[in-house]
């Protein structure tokens, strides 16, 4: 098994430090939680909604990382994948711009088909996003980002086996104001972001936000247009309506458009299958079509087809809240629609070997109603949830090897799922608190799959009632039990058992060379045994949080690619590890953050392409991961200068569940830096930045097609990017 060494002296000091440290609704005008101070000499509290009510982060008995507006800005976190650099245990895989899937503590879903839901759930202003293809590339005008590690099977429930990520946008308030940012960078980057807040009356306020992202392709294609460019526009319009002293409604309209981006961000590498069928890199050898890339630079490629990516995402959310002396009623209604066109050169070579296209449509409606209340030592929350979504996809493939003509895999997925949940919390004493919760989910799904190949000897039309397994229902019970102990002020110890589940489904094979009985797979279930601590010390100048966990993972939905056959199989797994997060203000205006993650995953039996089984590690689960950030501000030129550096180091990791030699990503580090000046009135700011300062080459995804084409194709993280941003802010 893959192992990585870690400096023992650092581990010892962190453990010692952890042992020593163990010795209501916002007002109408409030738009953001109190930012973590980087200009004062003490840490401010961070407000989160990890339990669907506002709490101090240090009072929540769970492993949570949160970024407020100030932190997002000073770290220069702009894209939805940038946050992985400062969240212990968080990775991501991204098949170009088309699909983004987070990996938290090794829990993920590597299937690139759009109909799959991810086990790390994404919430946008309390609304669950079921489609992995709907996650846009840009974060803008956010109040907060929260990352909750571990199963969230009670209050959030749906498919949050590994955890969840919440994006909370800035809301309209009663004061006029706004901002505008303009960025110019290398690769022709031209980006802008802005927001304008305006009260319309004593009871109505509006906020409009937008972001545009454009850059030329990172990959130089000697045969045509550069690859991996971006041309995206996103916007959000919100109305906040105060209907009475005790109630308000928030209406949000939002949309994203990606226009004619060049997709297929693959880099080619020669490979051959070994005796087990897993790929081994064979540098210098041509692939099966006779091609060999002479360049060792992954950003120099030769592809005969220009890929394409068009996407439109739009939706609406209505959030209502009614407060009484006894309880608060909250309603969240959400509608989301996605349309996508995607095409790629799958073989990554200048020869016409295999092209793959996707035409994808998705729509969902969800509704949540919940009540929460309590008095004295007792607090409670109960609610119901319903989601209905439909997705359809056509995946035509073209290849000279198609003896019976080009083919098209067509499939449609429908899901109707109600759920009910409840959680109670009781203070046993001033120091002890007990918490218990449960959720029941009914998942009613149907799948219609057609492999359309008119000249083929036989075709497969997988649909009920001809195939009864094409219509399935699942009864999922999840929940948690937790005990919290406060031995002293500003210190919390907790222990919990959490159970999460993700519904079963179907593989959506694009080749059609598959038996009907291999399409369905069962739900996965994860039980998390966890202990942790949270502490604030050194006169509110230091914060240290830590956790240890053990995952018992039943029927993990593992993704396998055998030739052109894409299949999901249930396998058991275990996963254990922990995290530490340290935040310091050692000097006035100096902020230091440090994070550590350790993982040990084990899958006893995976399927091998050549037959048989072998043990493996979970994909994208490095044994060690470190992140750090330092930010300092000082007065100069009548204003404030700021400087910051941050980065992340990952030990070696496998990118696919097959654990082949070709998908082993060696350890690597990525570093970023930022230098800025802010005017005395806080209206103007100018900043220069560089990301991936050392221009480190590292892969975030790998696809083993060695047995089919004689190569593997990978997706690399962005190269070095740099530029400057000018910002103007007005009002509050």
Model-predicted regions and their roles:
Residues 1-87, 197, 245-246, 316, ...:
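N-terminal Sec signal peptide and the immediately downstream disordered periplasmic leader
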Residues 31, 379, 427, 434, ...:
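Gram-negative outer-membrane beta-barrel transporters
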Residues 39-175, 531:
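Acidic, small-polar-rich N-terminal luminal/periplasmic segments of exported/outer-membrane proteins
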Residues 117-119, 131, 140-149, 154-221, ...:
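Outer-membrane beta-barrel translocator/receptor signature
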Residues 166, 174-175, 183, 194-294, ...:
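Periplasmic-side early beta-strands and strand-to-turn transitions of outer-membrane beta-barrels
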Residues 240-244, 371-372, 377, 383-387, ...:
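Structural signature of Gram-negative outer-membrane beta-barrels, strongest in the C-terminal barrel
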Residues 317-344, 486, 492-500, 520-578, ...:
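Membrane-embedded beta-barrel scaffold of Gram-negative outer-membrane proteins
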Residues 648-656, 677-732:
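C-terminal beta-signal and adjacent terminal beta-strands/loops
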